Structures are given as structure tokens and as C-alpha cells.
Amino acid sequence: MATKIKLQRLGKMREPHYRIVVADARTKRDGRVIEAIGQYHPKSDPSIIKVDAERAQHWLSVGAQPTEPVLAILKVTGDWQKFKNLPAPPPMKVAEPKADKREIFQAAARAAAGAEDRPATTPKKAKKAASADGADAPAADAPTAAGQ
């Protein structure tokens, strides 16, 4: 029986994700599969590629032929080079870890609490604050008798 390693499409319109599967060469794209050996999510940045390397090596060794898209994925993960005894590919780009939402919220809360203690930033509010705090103190802009 001729087997192929191919992509089985899942997801909705304009949001595809794929399973990397081993199936009989005569089956349809989304038909019956023998074994699922990985996943591929092209829309995420960087795209997510998960391949069970041990199972991929097994199926390649028993003669399963990868389709062109799967061959490209296997080259990126290094499974094809391992099968063909070629040098390993350069390392893949790894997604940055996401920041913890709780820490972001707490930092924003601390910043908001610190904003209440700051002095007024607009001139009108600054004059009101100055007149309320120093009602008997002369204003800096007011002319004095000694200064003329």
C-alpha cells in the first residue's frame, strides 16, 4: 500500500490549521487517515509547527512519501535532514513569551494610584491649588512696591 504524509485541513474559512497525517495515497485530502503525526498553524506569528519526530522518521523509513508542503515543513523542523543524513537546518524562530495579564493590570493600577498624588498639570488647576494653599501669600507675578 502506497502511503503519503500530507496535510489535513481543519479550521474555518480564512483561519486554516492543519494536521500532518499519514494516509493511503488514494484517499481524499480530508479522508480517512492511518495516523496523525503533527500540527501546523500557519496564521499565528511565528507559525506553529509540531511534529512527532519519532513517528515521522518511522513513516519515512517504511517508504511514506511526503507531499511538497509537508516536505517543506519537515525540512524546517530538521526531520528530513535527519532522514537523509544531511546537516541540520538553522534554528527556528521561537515566539516571545506573553506577559502575564495580572502583572500588567497591577502595574497599571500602581501607575493610576501614583497619578493621584501628582500636582496639577494645567495652569488653571495650578492657580486654583496655589490660591487655596497660599491664600495669604502674595502671588509671584504680582508687582510689589519694592520691585518698581
Swiss-Prot record:
Disordered: annotated segments: 107-148
Please verify whether the record's keywords include Ribosomal protein: yes
Q: Which residue windows does the record flag with biased composition (Low complexity)?
A: 129-148
Q: Which domain of life is it from?
A: Bacteria
Which key words tag this protein in UniProt? Ribonucleoprotein, Ribosomal protein
Write down the InterPro entries for this protein, in alphabetical order.
Ribosomal_bS16 (IPR000307), Ribosomal_bS16_dom_sf (IPR023803)
Which pairs of positions does the record mark as disulfide bonds?
Answer: none
Give the Gene Ontology MF terms in alphabetical order: structural constituent of ribosome
Q: Which Gene3D superfamilies match?
A: 3.30.1320.10
Does the record carry Magnesium as a key word? no
Q: Name one GO biological process term.
A: translation
GO CC entries = cytoplasm; small ribosomal subunit
- According to its UniProt record, which protein family does this protein belong to? Belongs to the bacterial ribosomal protein bS16 family.
Official protein name in the record: Small ribosomal subunit protein bS16
Origin organism is Frankia alni (strain DSM 45986 / CECT 9034 / ACN14a)
